[in-house]
């Protein structure tokens, strides 16, 4: 198993290290355009193997040739969001970057599974899919895993319970329009609605929607990376170990939930072939409406890129 991580910034480097420590691949390649950065970080990671007890090889490079024959490619490249900058502000800049990165990746790997982390997430997943020519099930966006993790964290904090006992799901686009599904949220099987009043639940939902910007506002010059990296690696682990995990991911919908030809976060079965099944769960009328509105925003942004993508 060979996994390539594109982008040696905070998310990419953290993800590469987690992949190595979990020994999810025989070889991890970290690629970045800045000379010396991927090489230095990769060497540092590799040298930690004797202490962290992993045998995974970690290579840093500026050359996409070193990504040849990758089974999985994690794309984290792009401009990071700054205070006052919406994900949509990043649209044009990152679309160009992702298109070029994906084109380079496909020169050397015939049939990889691509996992997208770069923002705006849903649109960048679309860009990678168009640029790669890969089947839709092999180009996946990391959104719902991260958003759900934040949602679970806030619930656990509010109730003073273990996060391990919380079952929850956040669907829709990765942004202000995301849709935490309260109807399917429970703590050890107990519905959240029986544990918290509606106003508290509404506050948790709102904080989840603003989870990324909350961190951006603290950091000032950067954005979240520990939780995004952990979320991406959870997806990678589900694929490499063929675990058939049911988790929310960004995938191309073709009629599911009444949404056509749009990348949107929904529950999927994740295995060795990528997205192996899209699950259509019963949503309330308001949840379904919110999901469709979220998808419509993604669709609008994708249409704005039509000229760029040709």
UniProtKB/Swiss-Prot annotation:
Pfam families: Ldh_1_C, Ldh_1_N. Gene3D superfamilies: Lactate dehydrogenase/glycoside hydrolase, family 4, C-terminal, NAD(P)-binding Rossmann-like Domain. The gene is mdh. The lineage of its organism: Bacteria, Pseudomonadati, Chlorobiota, Chlorobiia, Chlorobiales. It catalyses: (S)-malate + NAD(+) = oxaloacetate + NADH + H(+). InterPro entries: L-lactate/malate_DH, Lactate/malate_DH_C, Lactate/malate_DH_N, Lactate_DH/Glyco_Ohase_4_C, Malate_DH_type3, NAD(P)-bd_dom_sf. PANTHER family: L-2-HYDROXYCARBOXYLATE DEHYDROGENASE (NAD(P)(+)), L-LACTATE DEHYDROGENASE. Its EC number is 1.1.1.37. This is Malate dehydrogenase. One of its GO terms (molecular function) is L-malate dehydrogenase (NAD+) activity. It comes from Pelodictyon phaeoclathratiforme (strain DSM 5477 / BU-1). The active site is at residue 174. Substrate binds at residues 81, 87, 119, 150. Keywords: NAD, Oxidoreductase, Tricarboxylic acid cycle. It is an enzyme of class 1 (oxidoreductase). NAD(+) binds at residues 7-12, 32, 94, 117-119. Belongs to the LDH/MDH superfamily. MDH type 3 family. One of its GO terms (biological process) is lactate metabolic process. Catalyzes the reversible oxidation of malate to oxaloacetate.
